[in-house]
Regions:
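Glycine-rich phosphate/nucleotide-binding loop
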Residues: 146-248
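Phosphate-binding loop/pocket of nucleotide- and phosphate-handling active sites
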Residues: 259-278
Length: 278
């Protein structure tokens, strides 16, 4: 399915996150965000090309929170062998499929010795079945620092972690390509998948026709590839990259002056031309 941005209120006794609920209901355990510099949009830290893989069904996002008293609340971090095994396999399989050589397991095992220690042990066990792919544990604080000092060290790597850690890291990584409006994502399970732009909602821009449509368009294109419409998907991806490279019909966050609809129409026109020629 395809899901657009929604707002989740931060107060107790309000509805849960739509995305989190869908991931858990349909067991969409792999939240995947490609982080790749777009043409003509190289940021101050240079070109990047890696993938963030996030376990999407448990961790601190299981909703196991309790108010013990007026002065104390707790949240339970759930880490299971099943979830760790399948997200590790997904990351290693993706690295192998892409011909990349390393999976990075982001953790805080020196402090969270039980939960992250368990996670790392399972990753190590899974890694034994992938002799062609290296793996490296990385403390989350160090990874976050290196991501803004020398992000190229992670190029052609799969960065993988538990739910909350990778939620934060993938947002930080999105800044490396200039705009969260360019980051598309997929939530993959064994039977179902959900595709969505990585960014949340932005009610302050309602009706202004100014936000970047790239993530929305490319999430849909990725869904087309998932359901077997590779030719259509490839045409939309190429058209989007071409429009951004040309720079004439892009939104303000990409240093342009186009509206949302103008950029979307430019991509649609170019995709139609590509399909007509093929």
């Amino acid at each position: 399915c395809y899901k657009g941005p929604t707002t989740t209120l931060p107060t107790p006794d309000t509805p849960r996150s739509v995305a989190v609920s869908i991931r858990q209901f349909f067991d969409l355990y792999a939240n995947v965000r490609p982080i790749k510099t777009f043409p003509n949009q190289v940021g101050p830290l240079g070109e990047v090309d890696f993938v963030c893989v996030r376990e999407g069904t448990e961790g601190l996002y299981t909703g196991l929170e309790h108010r013990l008293s007026d002065d104390c609340a707790i949240s339970i971090r759930k880490i299971t062998r099943r979830a760790c095994t399948r997200i590790a396999r997904y990351a290693f399989d993706m690295a192998r499929e892409k011909g990349w050589k390393k999976v990075i397991a982001i953790n805080k095992g020196n402090i969270l010795k039980e939960t992250d220690g368990f996670f790392l042990k399972i990753v190590e066990d899974v890694a034994r079945n992938y002799s062609d792919v290296e793996w490296e544990p990385y403390f989350i604080d160090n990874f976050a620092q290196q991501l803004v000092k020398n992000p190229q060290r992670f190029n052609q790597n799969i960065a993988m972690s538990t739910n909350l850690f990778m939620d934060v890291i993938s947002e930080e990584a999105s800044g490396l390509i200039g705009s969260i409006g360019c980051v598309y994502s997929a939530n993959i399970g064994d039977k179902y998948a959900m595709f969505e732009p990585a960014h949340g909602s932005a009610p302050k821009y309602k009706g202004m026709n100014k936000v970047n449509p790239t993530a929305t368009i490319l999430s849909g294109a990725w869904m087309l590839d998932y359901i077997g419409e590779k030719q259509l998907s490839d045409a939309i991806f190429k058209a989007t990259y071409d429009v951004i490279a040309e720079g004439a019909s892009v939104t303000y966050d990409l240093k342009g002056k186009a509206s949302t609809s103008e950029m979307a129409e430019a991509i649609a026109d170019k995709a139609k031309a590509i399909l007509t020629q093929s």
